Amino acid sequence: MEQAALKSSVRKEMALKTTSPVYEEFLAVTTAQNGFSVDDFSVDDLLDLSNDDVFADEETDLKAQHEMVRVSSEEPNDDGDALRRSSDFSGCDDFGSLPTSELSLPADDLANLEWLSHFVEDSFTEYSGPNLTGTPTEKPAWLTGDRKHPVTAVTEETCFKSPVPAKARSKRNRNGLKVWSLGSSSSSGPSSSGSTSSSSSGPSSPWFSGAELLEPVVTSERPPFPKKHKKRSAESVFSGELQQLQPQRKCSHCGVQKTPQWRAGPMGAKTLCNACGVRYKSGRLLPEYRPACSPTFSSELHSNHHRKVIEMRRKKEPTSDNETGLNQLVQSPQAVPSF
C-alpha cells in the first residue's frame, strides 16, 4: 500500500514539473547540445515504475540469502559444541560419514574443523587416565595409517641390569705402555681376586660369562722403574768417583774445605774461602785472622773480628820494638871521642 501511494504522488509531481517553463528551457538546452528532439524523449518512459515486481523479487532473494548465511554461521557452533560434549571423539569418522552437500560451508572451513577435531582428540589421548598410570594406550586406526592392528608403546630396557664395576685409579705415574687383557692375571693380590669374584659371581649375566674384568698389563717395551733407579745410582757413584780423583780444595789461609764461594788470593784464583777472599780484596787479611769454622782456629792466637785482630797486633809490637833497640845498642858501640 505504501509503495502504491508513493508511485501515485511521484507521477503527479512529475506531471506538474513537465508543464513548468523552467523544465521547457532545460529541454531546449539539452536538445541543442545533444542533437535529439524533445519528441523522441519522454519523461513517462524514464519514470516508468511498472517493474515493481522485479524489485520485490530482488528484496526477497536478499532476505533469503541473509537467512542462509545466518543459519550456516550457527551450524558450525552447534557442531563444535557437540564435538566437545561427546566422549568418544570420533572426529574423522563423523566428518567422513556426512556428505559435503549437507554442510553449506566452503572447503577451507571443513579443513579447519577437521584440524580442530584432530587436535582435541590428540590432546585428550595424550593426557588420558590410562596413560598416566603407565600402561600402553591404543591409538585409533586413522592415526596409524593403513594398519589394522593398534600400535602399543614399547618400553626399551638396557642389556646391562647390573652396573659395570670399575677399578679405582691409583695416583702413581703410568709411564709404560699398557695392554688390556681379557683374562684375569694370577699375580693379582687377594683383595683384587676377591673383588673380581664378587663382581663376576652372577653367572646369569651374559656380559661376564666369557671374560673377567679387564686389568692392565705392563709390556717390556720400556725399561721398568727399578732400572731407572739403577741409572740414577750409577750416575751418583760416577760423580763421587770423579770427586775422589780430583784433589780436595781448601783455603790456603785458614784451611776451610767448604765455602759458598771460592775467591782469588795471593796463590791464584779460587784459593781462598769466601771470608778470607773478601778481606784479602779489601786489604785486611792478616795472619791473626781466622774464621770460626776454621780447623786451625785458636782463641788465644786468632780472632774473626777485625778490631780484636788489631789489638792483638798492638800488644805484640812494643816487645818487638824494645828487643830491636837493645840489639842495636849492643851491636853498635858508641864511638869514643878523640882527644
From Swiss-Prot:
A motif (Nuclear localization signal) lies at residues 167-174. The keyword DNA-binding applies. Residues 68-88, 126-145, 163-206, 221-242, 314-339 are annotated as: Disordered. CDD domains: ZnF_GATA. InterPro entries: GATA_TF, TF_GATA_pln, Znf_GATA, Znf_NHR/GATA. Residues 181-206 have a biased composition (Low complexity). PROSITE patterns: GATA_ZN_FINGER_1, GATA_ZN_FINGER_2. Belongs to the type IV zinc-finger family. Class A subfamily. This is GATA transcription factor 5. It comes from Arabidopsis thaliana (Mouse-ear cress). The lineage of its organism: Eukaryota, Viridiplantae, Streptophyta, Embryophyta, Tracheophyta. The gene is GATA5.
